[in-house]
């Protein structure tokens, strides 16, 4: 499967994830220019700051991702007299409150992050009082199969959190890499088989939910 193809069972490619994250971010930080034109969205996707990894997407790639997302009701085109513009529909499609939308957007743009990183990076997007509020919303997302909790590994001081809407193969790669990172530690410090099974169950539940939304 190429990078720009939509994944099956309601999953999203890395480009689609970047598009959604960029729309969510600009909705909060640049309301005067939101919804975004295609050119503005390409620039947002290719930013060299607040993006991990940095990408170099073409208008064609972003446009194809938008059409795929529109088909899954995750983005919507607003036709205008001067230019067509795009808006995200993640909050509507997944029934997210603003705090949850912001966290999903940050994880879309930068992948696995600690509670403190999410708190710091959300300061322009949402007013979280402390890390406890961040954790509470993440736990709600995890309970719905929309996010994953990744226990800390060797050389790390904190657990990390990431979204669960990407390609299942990519999620499995993250989990496998974290297992390998923890291979030099005791068995109690690595990701357990039970936790991996639980995460896979959450992924399956999310796929079923997204399939219902598409139907």
UniProtKB/Swiss-Prot annotation:
Chain ranges passing through the membrane: none
Pfam families: DUF480
SUPFAM superfamilies: Winged helix' DNA-binding domain (SSF46785)
Similarity comment: Belongs to the UPF0502 family.
Name listed for the protein in its UniProt record: UPF0502 protein PSEEN2299
Species annotation: Pseudomonas entomophila (strain L48)
